[in-house]
Every structure is written in structure tokens, then in C-alpha cells.
A protein has these predicted regions:
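Basic, glycine-enriched DNA-binding surface that flanks or lies within the catalytic cores of DNA
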Residues: 1-45, 50-53
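Short active-site oxyanion
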Residues: 55-60, 108-109
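Helix N-cap/beta->alpha junction signal
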Residues: 63-64
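Conserved Rossmann-like nucleotide-cofactor binding loop
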Residues: 67
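TOPRIM fold recognition
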Residues: 73-178
């Protein structure tokens, strides 16, 4: 689904680059994830990675794009769901974008953050946001540390996505260079 939505590129050494967009769908940055490193594009803005229908009533908030994609896979990419990621941070632009989504009528804001201390901090922020905007809320916590680990367990793999992704994206999906 992420490839069909043109959200992924292959970076150096088989790394995954996930597109972050603003409310109008304009590209504002890339979350970069390699086998031994993580980062965000220099000069990019952490708004949201968005996978799924932009008018979905259910908004699942994860920390990383790989977890948003993993949760979508585990749930069968529910048509009523928009899977978003914050890039492991919570910028002012992220706050504004999430509030816009939470303020829509009939929104269910799902805190699908990691099952660790940082994930609980984000889940609490999401809970408060839901209360402030008047939307419904739910805490969906992975049994493993994160959704990617759960997906790998389900699929019977011992390795993480990053370890087998090298070359997985076609050449036309690679990030612009230069």
C-alpha cells in the first residue's frame, strides 16, 4: 500500500526513506531508516507520514513510519483507517496536523505507540489531545516493543525489516540524489 501511494524510496545502502507530508499532501521531509541508523532529512519538517485514506474516521498514531506500515499490514489495511507516524518526535507541526485530524467529526484517535516509556508519553499526549478536541480515543499497544517486531513474529522472520529490505524497492522509488 505504501508503494502504491508513492510514499517510499530506497536510499543509500538499501535504506528506507518514508515520505512525510503536510495537510495538503506536499512532501516536506523523509524519515530515513537503515540497518544501523535512523534519521530525518536535513531541512525536512516532521509533520506526519500518512498511509491510507486521508478522510478515514480512525487515525492510528505511531512513532515511526515502519510501525505505521506494520500496523496497517497486521490489520489488513483497514479502509476506515489512516495510519500516521510522527517520526519519533513531536514537533509543533506534528501537533497542529494531529489536532486537525482529531477535530474532524466522528474521529477515533488511536494511540498506537510503542510499548515502552517513550510510547506511553506519546500515548498520554494523544489522550489529552482527544479530550481537548472532543474526539473518541483508544490505546492500542503492541505485545512486542513495537508493531514491526509483532509483524516479523507473525510472519515467522527472525530479522527486522531493515535487514532484508536492501534492494526491495524498485529503482524508480529511490530518493532523489544530489
Amino acid at each position: 500500500a505504501a508503494i502504491r501511494q508513492d510514499l517510499l524510496r530506497e536510499g543509500p545502502k538499501g535504506s528506507m526513506w518514508a515520505a512525510y507530508t503536510d495537510d495538503d499532501g506536499a512532501l516536506v521531509g523523509w524519515e530515513e531508516r537503515g540497518s544501523r541508523w535512523r534519521g530525518f532529512s536535513t531541512g525536512g519538517e516532521k509533520v506526519l507520514f500518512r498511509l491510507g485514506s486521508t478522510d478515514a474516521s480512525r487515525v492510528c498514531v505511531t512513532e515511526a513510519a515502519i510501525d505505521a506500515m506494520s500496523l496497517a499490514d497486521l490489520e489488513g489495511s483497514r479502509p476506515d483507517s489512516l495510519y500516521v507516524a510522527t517520526g519519533g518526535g513531536w514537533s509543533p507541526a506534528t501537533e497542529v496536523a494531529l489536532r486537525r485530524l482529531a477535530s474532524r467529526p466522528e474521529t477515533l484517535l488511536v494511540a498506537a505507540t510503542d510499548a515502552d516509556a517513550q510510547g506511553e508519553i506519546y500515548a498520554e499526549r494523544i489522550r489529552k489531545m482527544a479530550e481537548e478536541t472532543g474526539c473518541r480515543r483508544l490505546r492500542l499497544s503492541p505485545v512486542q516493543r513495537d508493531w514491526n517486531l509483532m509483524l516479523q513474529e507473525k510472519k515467522g522472520r527472525g530479522e527486522r525489516w531493515e535487514e532484508w529490505a536492501e534492494g526491495a524497492l524498485p529503482p524508480d522509488r529511490r530518493p532523489p540524489r544530489g
